[in-house]
Each structure stands twice: as structure tokens, then as C-alpha cells.
């Protein structure tokens, strides 16, 4: 069961946010894109995620995640990251940010996390 303090912190961050950036890598990027659309439709909050055009433009410059996160920090009140590994390269880039929620199979030590329990992670 999720810690109530963390659960309250996650809910508070979401309620306060006017704009939300979602990010993931691989299959989680597709989930982030779909989730951004659904979140906008159900909440009316401005939600966005990188798409293949962004990745093509940023990908040639090496680590696209850093560049995209810089962009997201400037345009979003909240960043939601989706990952299969709680200690992924993406997660390490988010550790020092206050406005982050993580979706992952396990809880992160410092980032408020919504734990996705499933046998096959991409089937939630």
C-alpha cells in the first residue's frame, strides 16, 4: 500500500499543476504520449509529451532526454516520468527536481512514486 504522506504529496502536485509534461523511453514514451492526451481530455490541464519529431530533432545531439527535460521544466508545472526501472538514466536526471511524479514498478527513494504492479509492466 502506498504511504499516505507520499500519496497526498502526489495528489497535491497534480491538483496544483496547470501544465504537465510526460516522458518515458521506448514503449513508455508511447504510453506517455497516450497518457498526455487522456489527461487533457479528462482534466482540461495542458499536457504534453515528446513525439517522434522531437526525438528526431533532439536525438542527433546525443542525450535527447536532458534537452527535452530542459524544455519541459520551462513549460510545465509538473513532470510525470514513466519507467520500467526505478534507477534508470531518465530517473537519475529527475532526482533533484521538486515537481516530479514517477510511475514505476518499485518505489524510488526520493521521488514520489506511483507504483504500477503487474506481471508484464507494459500491460497496465
Model-predicted segments: where are they?
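A short, well-structured juxtamembrane/interface segment
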Residues: 2-17
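Glycine-rich phosphate-binding loops that contact phosphosugars or nucleotide phosphates
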Residues: 21, 25-124
Amino acid at each position: 500500500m502506498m504511504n499516505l504522506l507520499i500519496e497526498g504529496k502526489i495528489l497535491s502536485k497534480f491538483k496544483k499543476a496547470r501544465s504537465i509534461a510526460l516522458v518515458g523511453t521506448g514503449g513508455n514514451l508511447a504510453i506517455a504520449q497516450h497518457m498526455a492526451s487522456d489527461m487533457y481530455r479528462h482534466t482540461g490541464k495542458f499536457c504534453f509529451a515528446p513525439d517522434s519529431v522531437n526525438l528526431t530533432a533532439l536525438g542527433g545531439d546525443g542525450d535527447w532526454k536532458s534537452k527535452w527535460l530542459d524544455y519541459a521544466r520551462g513549460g510545465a508545472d509538473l513532470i510525470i516520468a514513466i519507467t520500467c526501472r526505478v534507477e534508470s538514466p531518465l530517473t537519475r536526471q529527475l532526482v533533484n527536481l521538486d515537481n516530479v511524479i514517477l510511475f514505476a514498478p518499485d518505489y524510488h527513494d526520493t521521488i514520489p512514486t506511483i507504483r504500477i504492479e503487474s506481471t508484464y509492466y507494459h500491460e497496465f
